[in-house]
Every structure is written in C-alpha cells, then in structure tokens.
Amino acid sequence: MMRTRKGHKVYPLTVAQKFHLYYAPHCPNMAVLNIGTSLTIEVELDWDQLKKSINEAYARNEGMRVRFAKDKEGTWYQYVMDPEEREIEFVDFSDKTIEEAEAEMQKWTTVPFKMFDAPLTRIVMIKMPDGFNGVYFLGNHMIVDAQSLICFLKDIIELYCNAKYEGVPYPKDMASYVEQIQRDFAYEAGSKAQLRDIEYFQKEIEKSEPIYNDLHGTEKLQSMREMFKNPELRSAFCVTDDTKSALDIFHLEAEPTKRLMDFCEKYHVSLACLLLMGLRTYYQKMNGFDDVSLTTTIARRATLKEKKSGGTRIIPSRSARSFHRI
C-alpha cells in the first residue's frame, strides 16, 4: 500500500476518476481522456505577463497539479505536486490560415498524456491569423472537467488583467482540491448521507433494468434482440474505435438563447442540466421508451468551494416519464 509519493501524501481515486479508468483502457489509446480548447481575444497581449499569470494560476490551483501513481499491486493513487515554474510554449499561427491553425491544435488534442508522475495539462500561448490571441488548453479528464477548466482559464484572465490594468482587483483564492476530495471520501466511508443515497438509488435500480436508447431510434436494439433471439433484451453494443476529435460550431438564435438563459435563472437550473434534460427528451421521442439513462461527466458542484476546487466530477441520470406527456 502506497502512503507517499515523491514526498507527497497520496490519496485514493475519486468515483469520477475510477469511472474514467473503467472505460479508457478499452479504447485505442488514452487520448480518449483528452479535453482540448482554446480561448482567444482580439487584442495584443503581453506574452511575458501572460506566461507569469499562467504559472501563478497553476500555483493557486491544487487540482491542476495532480499526478498519478500505481503501487506494486496495481492500485492507483493521486497526489498534488508543489508549485513549480513551467515552461509555457508559444506558437505563432499568423502566417497560417484559420483552418490550418485549428487542424494543428486538433492534432495536439490527439496526443495522450503520460499517466504516471507527469503533468496532465498543457497550455500553449497562441497568436492566431485573424488577429486574435490567447491560449490553447489541453487537459486530461482524470483531473479536469468543464467546470474546473472554465474556472482555471478565468483565473488566468483575472490574474493577467490585475497585473496589466489599473482598478482590476486580484482574484479571490481558489479552494483546496485536497480538502474537497477528503470530504468526498468521508461521504463514501459509510456516512448517513451515503446510506440514504444508496437506499434511494437501489430502489430506482430495482424498479426495472435500464433500456438502451439510440440517437437514431430503436433499430440498433431491435438488431441485438434478433441476434440474441431475445425479444425482451434491453441492452445493445454501442462501441467505436475512433477517438479522433473534431470541432463543430452551432449558432443558436438570440431569442431562443435568451429563453433558455431566463429559464435557468428563474428556476436556478444550470445550463448543463437543462441540456441534459433536453437530451433525455430527445432520446425518449426517438425511441419511444419511458425510461432513459445517461452517464455524463458534468459539473456536479453545489457549493462555491466545490466549484473552485478543480478536479473532475460525475453524475448518473435516469429519468422515467410517461411518453404521452411529452
């Protein structure tokens, strides 16, 4: 059993991290865990100051300094490295086309991280051909999700603006990643809250076996039922060996966007959860089943400390609703 690694206390993996390690080994390579994005603005940047702000953001964020290790028995552990000065890359795309720049960054996103005792994020300062400048960020889903990614990039922006412009306040401290996962482990160690949740979800699971829902309707499930000669089969294969990333941009008109945002504000629902409910409704209409199950690594954070502690979270979603009511 490992207790320390490189002088740092080690901790078990969280539920979300265990989930990622459940499916990732069955994929062609570990790049399936990569999250790549870019953030740019149409203004000239002080690259030296931006580099300082990036390193300062790393120093303020325990979750972005997480490393992983395995013991002799094959058990995974995580630990947090001390802050260190990182060499931040700079790439000038100004002599390229936008398409060439995007293609190059998509290539970066296909390169898997080393999983042991190594950084699991990468930042590149980028100068784009259209006059926009900023950063490309690549993170491993074992330590990053949408919420922690946004929070980290926001911190870089606020640190940079504080250093460059008068009257811009210094950002508030980030929350401790270690303290947050310790609270999670306390919950998982037989707490009353966990026991209540287990009882609830056990009842939900025992109601009926989840059924496969497909983007394109029931054809896949029907073919599985015929293959296995089981008309009551509720599961189906849905696998691919393609882990390539791609970029799709969808433009939503102003009026429906405003209605969505107003709904979220009025009922205190996150946009991610609203989109999840929309997916559930779509699957139900396409397949005709009352029961829809989704597993999604969304920003499951209820408190400010959870939102600012970084890391990756996961929430299962199962919805059963009469079809004729939709």
Task: Report residues per predicted region.
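Short, solvent-exposed loop/turn segments at secondary-structure junctions
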Residues: 73-74, 84-85, 130, 140-144, ...
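Generic recognition of long tandem-repeat/solenoid scaffolds
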Residues: 75-81, 101-103, 135, 167, ...
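Short amphipathic alpha-helices and their capping loops
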Residues: 1-28, 51-96, 119, 154, ...
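Active-site-proximal acidic secondary-structure segment that organizes catalysis
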Residues: 3-5, 10-12, 16, 91, ...
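A generic structural motif
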Residues: 41-45, 139-144, 323-326
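Helical lid/core segments from catalytic subdomains that handle acyl or acyl-like groups
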Residues: 167, 199, 203-210, 313-326
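Gly/Ser/Thr-rich phosphate-binding loops and adjoining beta-strand/alpha-helix segments
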Residues: 2-13, 17, 30-49, 115-137, ...
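Structural preference for long, well-ordered alpha-helical segments in enzyme cores
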Residues: 16-17, 46-65, 101-109, 122-125, ...
